[in-house]
């Protein structure tokens, strides 16, 4: 049965290029069979034959943006946001490893649907996620993602050093590999390709070289993603140096174990040397920039301008529970403010709001090799979009608020970055399917 078309009306806003935002006041997009079929002024789109039978959402006091992309977060950690500790490694030991240890099938079955509902309420339509080390709860996370309608790349954490699991050390590697293989065979490419697998050796502190090499080989064998963490914290970097003295730096550990490449997503990457950045650029590896987490755990500030100038692909990420919330608008705001703060002590280029927004939409999609499918509101792309209530964002004191017909894209974007959040999300669509809707998201056209 062919699904009913959906049309979204509002200020159409996206960022197809890094320094370029594009806006259309009182515009509309039409979504048919999961893809955007038309974009333009509301008066033109509303006269199209398919628009007559469409479900219309939004109105002149709304904004329509592409689905947001979060390329690094941890499902079982979400209940443990905002737990203060002096730095990364003590925080992991005190809060996170115990939380993940207890995240078994029953807990995941109850919690994961809430997690994916929260992503949708925040306007996120694609997320790259870690589960815990347990195979059973990873299955439940995938099942919840499938039911939610959201796009997800998920991996079961692998760790054979300082593991919180119950296996004897000499049994961890073969068991973890076999569990990961089963998860790949069940879920990689499931739900019509909406779900993908990411082999997930946690980081070099908690993985032997043997495990990392085996993980890289498994990912190559099955064509999956790889996700891990890199250069987040100074104590972490020093620990890696002590564990792997045969390598000149942290990034070389991953290079030597075969983990780098265009399907590898590396969280944080704050304290990289020039030679390490060159390795990431030359391998096509992707950085997940986690500004809220980087500040919360006192890890540092990633040099945005340096990473961008070096041509390393990157996207933004919430990194819950290191980051305290799933809202990518709050992550964008922190990304901007952290670079402003950095500029007080060192000369640097502060990214524009358009650039920040781009790296959460089209730029992130391009980094993940999905730029032709996602990231903007162009016809032909998949129908991932978010409908926002501008009355909840722009304080006008009028009811209804005046239309934003005289506002440019460069005027509106800072308002969204600094004031949008889950409370302003009226509806979220993934592949043309409503994955979240406020009761007020009715036809205002």
Label each residue range with its predicted role.
Residues 1-50, 62-63:
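N-terminal metal-binding scaffold of metallo-dependent hydrolase/deaminase domains
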Residues 17, 382-440:
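C-terminal cap of metal-dependent C-N hydrolases
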Residues 29, 34, 61, 72, ...:
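Divalent metal-coordination and catalytic microenvironments
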Residues 79-110, 156, 161-174, 233-263, ...:
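Active-site gating loops and adjacent loop-to-helix segments of metal-dependent hydrolytic enzymes
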Residues 82-150, 176-192:
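Alpha-helical scaffold segments that flank or form the walls of functional sites
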Residues 136, 140-269:
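Metal-coordinating catalytic core of metallo-dependent amide/deamination hydrolases
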Residues 256-263, 305-397, 401:
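His/Asp/Glu-enriched, well-ordered alpha-helical/loop segment
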